[in-house]
């Protein structure tokens, strides 16, 4: 355990170097400015979409979706818009919401978890939970969808410039992923468990919320 503490101390000292501290500070300031501007443009109800967008942009500089480049870009944008539509439909009725949430989360999770170790699903699930937790009226839906589309487009732009020169010959396209879908694979089972867990949590949250109204 002494060696573990020593390694931890060395790691802390390494991260306390002036250059690292300054770069981290600049990054934090940039994130705050981005989220603030996002909220100013699209409204406070959509500021968390900005949080998800900047999180995904930073993540996808290095992380890939295991999809062909063009399909990864399309999947990113459409997934964000799909989550906005699904969460609004889910608000009609808790049990309808459970079904809609389950299907949407499963589809999105499955498409981006071919390479499990990348955890590429995180910003998508985070976004779904955030927008589900900040309900809006139907009249506000167009603005939310625009916010989600812009967020997805910004992520796609970062993804394109970060991965356009990388070899994606071993990556799948969506049709191949659907054709080879197998309930015994880790990808399928993980997506199923993720969709079930998040959908149940959202159902319980909506029931508790209605009980306190």
PLM region spans:
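Alpha-helical transmembrane segments and their membrane-interface boundaries
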Residues: 1-212
């Amino acid at each position: 355990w002494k060696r573990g503490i020593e390694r931890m101390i060395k790691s802390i000292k390494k991260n306390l170097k002036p250059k690292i501290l300054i770069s981290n500070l600049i990054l934090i300031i940039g994130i705050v400015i981005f989220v603030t501007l996002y909220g100013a443009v699209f409204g406070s109800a959509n500021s968390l979409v900005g949080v998800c967008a900047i999180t995904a942009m930073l993540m996808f500089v290095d992380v890939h979706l295991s999809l062909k480049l063009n399909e990864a870009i399309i999947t990113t944008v459409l997934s964000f818009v799909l989550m906005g539509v699904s969460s609004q439909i889910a608000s009609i009725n808790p049990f309808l919401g459970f079904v809609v949430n389950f299907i949407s989360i499963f589809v999105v999770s499955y498409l981006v978890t071919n390479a499990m170790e990348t955890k590429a699903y995180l910003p998508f699930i985070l976004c779904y939970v955030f927008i589900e937790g900040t309900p809006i009226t139907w009249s506000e839906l167009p603005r939310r969808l625009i916010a989600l589309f812009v967020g997805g487009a910004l992520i796609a732009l970062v993804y394109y410039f970060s991965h356009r020169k990388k070899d994606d010959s071993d990556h799948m396209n969506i049709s191949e992923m659907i054709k080879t879908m197998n309930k015994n694979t880790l990808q399928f089972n993980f997506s199923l468990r993720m969709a079930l867990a998040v959908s149940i949590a959202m159902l319980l949250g909506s029931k508790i919320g209605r009980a306190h109204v």
